Design a protein with these regions (language model features):
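Residue-level detector of functionally pivotal "anchor" positions at catalytic/ligand-binding pockets or at interdomain
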Residues: 363, 694-718, 728
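Extracellular carbohydrate-recognition regions
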Residues: 534-560
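Short carbohydrate-recognition loop motifs
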Residues: 564-588
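Extracellular ligand-binding interfaces
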Residues: 582-661, 681-687, 694-697
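Short beta-strand-plus-loop segments that form exposed binding edges in beta-rich domains
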Residues: 673-681
Length: 781
């Protein structure tokens, strides 16, 4: 469980990750007995039909007003692109928007906030003051061919310009609408043989063909009553006073089990189709409602509706229905879509589900909650904590609350401790307890259980550190084959040479050049680590080519290979010139075989050279061959020159933007190879100068000629598009993608994590060609 907390009055939100599948799942649980929440069905842009449709996050934002805060939203019904309408019966605030089409089950919410599932059969009528009545065949029309019925009620959601021949009666309701309740009395505003139009307040009853002369005595100023009724069909009983209803297509589970004859009667066997999904469920008493959404992405596999229904049954659902899936699937919290689109792009939809707080606006903090309801961690492990602030109604005021000013304690104290960055350090004893956070007299509690861990060890036997970057000892343990990072601060550490480095809470900081042996003890457990400290300068020239007496050279295509100080380029105070003739041969290259063990932990390395036209034509690429501390081949970056004259080859010691692990240093440059283009050439000269390493001058900066860290985040595009970011302190990152028009189309908020470098795979595959803006907020920037 990644997150679990209340996002509104009686509205619980949970995010779960099943790594073994893999699957990411979101669920909301709504306590319908809470007086400050409602569930609403809404049409895109409040229009039927609506060929434009609307993103769920835009529905959420548009319909949030004071006292009507949309806490979460989901996509809902299947729809027709051409007609601009949903395919089943839906009810919005007591008004039927479209009555049947391909409809199957209905998931309804009554006026007293009770959920039910049934197969609906509409029986709707218009009744005049004189007692004449006519059956309403249809509600609203589609954009093209769905023009059903000889008696049609066009509601205030109608977006068509009515122009068909027939008889028109414009009406205005005196009260709210309801289905299976007291019929709605309306005033007759106009009666005409010419088209009349609907408005936000006015409906139009349209009569034609066999019903053209129905309600013959209706007059302006009289009453007309609209009765909307749903009667029993194949299963279930429609309740009284239905306020909201959602087409459920096939009923997947009914009365606690899979609904035989319904779940397995999905066209083309779609019940077994694996995709991302949105589904709805209810408890047996109808007072708890569930909505579930899953993601389909590179990191989350598809799943069928049967498996989701069984998951929901196991977690309290009694009836389960199926909403639209695939590219339409969307869960939105705080107007932000949480899942990645499942079919390659953001898809506007025809209608949605809103989970709404009707509580009065209140920005006063009355509650703090942790982002999880339970924490299960290994002993002596580290777990960053996240706090949420809420008002007295449980509306969220702020996520990822700043932890400054909080006092933390653990009960019992042996459970562990919480540092000033709100990182929990689990104790060394297996137990259960709780973490208590308190600020301004308001407390939050988090139940905690710690588990035993085996095979506790340090990941490396020997480590090289510098005098700038702190290094947390990489302590690991194992639970059932899963490796966990443990807390080195739980150990008592001794050093054979304390003058070269300092250790505090399991974190090393180099002081002066030297070596030490560290020993950590915890009860009967002992671990050891050899530490070498090499204090960093700003730069260090590893080769200035002043001494050429020991400079091994090798070539597959030259017998005249040499290096000298003759004929240096103008303005060069030092350096050397590599000179050779090239004869025809296979695999042509020239190699400088001198080896350089790089001092300390450089950020990057550079080599200056000067290329003539002849040298540029000869060189295919220049390759540096590095080995890591164990002597194995590690990295072979290649530089392809594209111009003549002075130039600098430079590489950062990173992969995909992430710095090489400290555990891999020291690195050794074994050779520099000039790979040549085929052919024969005479008197090729390559001037070389200053093989130089660059080092950080402080912990948060780096000197780097290629890989620039202007702030704390950078993007790489080597194979996949990735965003990399540094957390300088325990915290989270908020990453968003925007259009140039300022529309937010994706947001990802990481869990609170320990200081370090992290990677986010940018979901570019769902973006259409164009220009986008990516923003990241972390470290208070």
């Amino acid at each position: 469980t990644l997150e679990h907390y209340e996002i509104g009055p009686g509205i619980e939100y949970i995010k779960i990750r099943y790594e073994s599948v893999p699957l990411t799942l979101w669920a909301t649980t709504i306590d319908m007995t809470n007086p400050y929440n409602v569930i609403e069905q809404v049409q895109s842009n409040n229009s039927v039909p609506d060929l434009k449709r609307e993103l769920v996050q835009d529905m959420s934002k548009r319909l949030t007003t004071p006292g009507h805060k949309v806490c979460a939203a989901f996509n809902h019904d299947f729809f027709s692109y051409d007609e601009g309408v949903c395919i089943g019966l839906n009810i919005s605030n007591g008004v039927i928007s479209m009555p049947a089409g391909s409809g199957r089950s209905t998931f309804a919410i009554t006026q007293d906030k009770t959920a039910s599932v049934f197969f609906p059969v509409p029986e709707c009528k218009a009744i005049s003051a004189s007692g004449d009545e006519v059956t309403i065949d249809h509600f609203n029309w589609g954009a093209e061919t769905i023009r059903n019925g000889d008696c049609v009620l066009f509601t205030n959601m109608n977006s068509l310009n009515l122009d068909a021949e027939g008889r028109y009666i414009k009406i205005r309701p005196r009260s709210n609408w309801i289905v299976n309740g007291t019929p709605t009395v309306c005033d007759v505003l106009e009666v005409s043989d010419l088209p009349l139009q609907t408005s936000d307040t006015d409906f139009v009853l349209y009569l034609r063909n066999t019903k053209l002369n129905s309600l013959p005595d209706i007059k302006v100023g009289e009453e007309i009553t609209i009765s909307q009724k749903l009667v029993a069909g194949k299963f279930g009983t429609p309740p009284d006073n239905i306020l909201q209803a959602f087409h459920g297509y096939p009923s997947i589970a009914y009365e606690g089990k899979l609904h035989d004859g319904e779940y397995n009667d999905f066209e083309n066997g779609r019940e077994y189709e694996t995709s991302c999904r949105t589904m709805a469920g209810m408890s047996q008493d109808g007072k708890t409602v569930y909505f579930v959404a899953t993601e389909l992405s590179e990191n989350s596999t598809g799943i069928n509706c049967i498996d989701i229904a069984n998951w929901m049954l196991a977690h309290g659902a009694w009836n389960v229905v199926n909403f639209d899936s695939g590219g339409s699937t969307a869960i939105v919290v705080d107007h932000t879509m949480l899942n990645l689109p499942g079919r390659g792009s953001l898809r506007p939809v025809m209608d949605g589900v809103l989970l709404v707080s009707t509580a009065p606006e209140d920005n006063g903090v009355a509650h703090y909650s942790f982002s999880k309801t339970q924490l299960n961690v290994p002993i002596i492990s580290l777990a960053p904590l996240t706090l949420i602030s809420q008002n007295k109604y449980k509306d969220v005021i702020e996520r990822n609350v700043e932890v400054e000013g909080f006092a933390f304690r653990c009960e019992p104290a042996e459970l562990g401790w919480v540092d000033k960055g709100a990182v929990f350090h689990a104790g060394e004893t297996v137990m259960s307890g709780k973490i208590i956070a308190e600020k301004n007299g308001i407390t939050a509690e988090l139940p905690v259980s710690t588990r035993p861990v085996q095979d506790i060890h340090i990941a490396a036997d020997e480590i090289l550190i510098d005098s700038v970057r702190p290094y947390r000892i990489n302590l690991e343990g194992n639970i059932n084959g899963q490796v966990y990072t443990l807390d080195p601060a739980a150990f008592a550490w001794t050093s054979s040479n304390p003058s070269c480095c300092r250790i505090e809470n399991g974190i090393l900081k180099g002081i002066e050049n030297g070596e030490t042996s560290l020993v950590g003890t915890l009860d009967t457990i002992t671990v050891g680590l050899k530490v070498i400290v090499e204090v960093t300068p700003e730069t260090l020239v590893h080769e200035n080519f002043s001494d050429l007496s020991d400079f091994p050279l090798f070539s597959t295509v030259s017998n005249t290979l040499s290096i000298s100080h003759e004929e240096l380029p103008t303005g060069w105070p030092d350096g050397a010139v590599l000179q050779f003739d090239q004869k025809t041969g296979r695999n042509p290259y020239v190699e400088m075989g001198k080896s350089y063990r790089l001092y300390s932990l450089p950020d990057s390395i550079s080599l200056q050279l000067n290329l003539s036209k002849e040298a540029l034509a000869a060189i295919k690429h220049i390759r540096f061959d590095f080995t890591h501390k164990n002597g194995k081949s590690y990295w072979q970056p290649e530089y392809i020159p594209s111009d003549t004259g002075d130039q600098t080859i430079a590489w950062a010691f990173s992969k995909n933007g992430i710095a090489f692990p400290t555990e891999d240093f020291p690195l050794t440059l074994d050779r520099i190879r000039f790979v040549l283009n085929p052919g024969s050439r005479s008197e090729i000269t390559i001037p070389l100068r200053e093989l130089k390493a660059y080092y950080p001058v402080k912990a948060s900066s780096a000197i780097n000629n290629v890989h620039i860290e202007n702030n704390f985040a950078w993007i790489t595009a080597e194979g996949e598009l990735r965003l990399h970011y540094n957390l300088q302190q325990t915290g989270s990152a908020d990453i968003s993608i925007w259009t140039t028009a300022g529309q937010q189309i994706s947001e990802y908020i990481s869990n609170r994590e320990l200081p370090g470098t992290y990677t986010y795979n940018i979901p570019d595959r769902f973006l259409s060609p164009g220009i986008y803006i990516l923003t990241i907020r972390a470290n208070g920037k």
